From Swiss-Prot:
It comes from Zymomonas mobilis subsp. mobilis (strain ATCC 31821 / ZM4 / CP4). The keyword Protein biosynthesis applies. Gene3D superfamilies: Peptide deformylase. The keyword 4Fe-4S does not apply. Belongs to the polypeptide deformylase family. The active site is at residue 141. GO terms for molecular function: metal ion binding; peptide deformylase activity. NCBIfam families: pept_deformyl, PRK00150.1-3. This is Peptide deformylase. Its EC number is 3.5.1.88.
């Protein structure tokens, strides 16, 4: 397995629409494993393939839950060629962050419950009603496959302030090296 570089805003590749995964081969399995390793190291709870420069409809999620001893219990989930449909009108506000928009967080309103269809890493089809944090995370990562970032859900003013702060912090980090 290998750590992959994570693209950060304003990289234009983050705005690309991802294409359907058609071949479920060893290369895909390696990419999935590398994406999990990269996500865990970052650390994060979700990662879309486009965030590591691969414009395929693939995302990985792990909503790691700490156990009593403090160790995180891994629950890796792979979603290939996902399709999401909101269920009902209820929305949920969640403070989101993104590995491609480092150290920046903002509240985003998304449907509380979704119906999801996807393929797993072996190409098997699944369909499930999903709610809670997994629904939020899945919608966030799904946006990446369409070239959308969580900051696009913010007002222009909030987005501008967040980007200004991000670029200032990035410059400070670069100047300290």
């Amino acid at each position: 397995m290998a750590l992959l570089p994570i693209l950060e805003v304003p990289d234009p590749r983050l705005r690309e629409k991802s294409t359907v995964v058609e071949v479920f081969d060893d290369n895909l399995q390696r990419l999935i494993d590398d994406m999990f390793e990269t996500m865990y190291k970052a650390p994060g709870i979700g990662l879309a393939a486009i965030q590591v420069g691969v414009a395929k409809r693939l995302l990985v999620i792990d909503l790691q839950q700490p156990e009593e001893g403090g160790e995180a219990k891994r629950n890796p989930m792979v979603f290939i060629n996902p399709e999401l449909t909101p269920e009902g009108e209820e929305k949920r506000l969640y403070n989101e962050g993104c590995l491609s928009v480092p150290d920046q967080y903002a509240e985003v309103r998304r449907p509380s419950v979704i119906n999801a269809k996807w393929q797993d890493r072996d190409g098997n089809f699944h369909e499930e009603r999903i709610e809670g944090l997994l629904a939020t995370c899945l919608q966030h990562e799904m946006d990446h496959l369409e070239g959308i970032l969580f900051i696009d859900h913010l007002s222009r003013l909030k987005r501008g302030m967040l980007m200004k702060k991000l670029l200032k912090e990035r410059k400070l980090r670069e100047d300290s090296y």
